[in-house]
């Protein structure tokens, strides 16, 4: 009877709810339907606010970006000199989308400064590059860190993000607690520090609802997938566990001590892949798999939800996500974050770069 009344009084709402239940929409890499997102976000914001009131002695939290400008001629020359080292057997290891610069860093950095005002310091790791728009006077709490400051010269130059990420803990003056960003990840709304690190220092672990085993069975073996599988083999040697999930494509809360532990346990295995100039199937991905899961296994992190909209900017489905994000921004129903990933698509969107930048400008009111 209630359903009949709803159908006659509010047919639009009735059919919306019916199709949402029958064909749930998922925007993220966790088992959460779009209709469930507002409640989960509201709950996470409430819990973070409650925990922030505990007033434990606050610890500093930094942010680390890795960034490359592939339009830089000097970088292109270095890249050309070594690109023969990229094996054709390692899928996408030297794909141009891996190094494409769409100026996302400007907007991602803006999202951090706008929505995470409690961040202590921001570090941008580059290969002898500085963003053209960067002026130190305008960004007093942002430092540019060159690869040579954190990576042994015998491994330079490197175009392998796994190698770069293996050395994040070497950043001078980096705080024990930090959040790692790729430049295609954006904070979508104001967030408490407790969303990333609990007041007692325990980190959040944003686990994707994906199976690495199933991904491998499909036959598309990428260096990222291989690196995760390599990490699992190492962790299984020391821990009695059954890991099969990657992390959500969003920011990653990390601790320097987690990297130090990884290097202590697996130094020889890490050093073995550092000479790889480009991603290979023999790599380890420390920042986005080995260290976060090592922290979890050592009781230094716990699973948490992050509603992160994840999409391919080259896909013809991207504009739908842009409209959805802009509408949710207007309605104050924003996700925690979103990732504007760049990889090849069979049905490639025309002028995808311009459409992305237009959305970012509109979303962040720049």
Curated annotation (Swiss-Prot):
The keyword GTP-binding does not apply. Its EC number is 2.7.-.-. PANTHER family: N-ACETYLGLUCOSAMINE-1-PHOSPHOTRANSFERASE SUBUNITS ALPHA_BETA, PTHR24045. Belongs to the stealth family. GO terms for molecular function: transferase activity, transferring phosphorus-containing groups. Signal peptide: none annotated. Stealth proteins are part of a protein family that is conserved from bacteria to higher eukaryotes. Family members were first identified in microbes as proteins that help pathogens to elude the host innate immune system. Microbial stealth proteins are involved in the biosynthesis of exopolysaccharides. Stealth proteins are predicted to function as hexose-1-phosphoryltransferases. InterPro entries: Stealth, Stealth_CR1, Stealth_CR2. This is Capsular polysaccharide phosphotransferase LcbA.
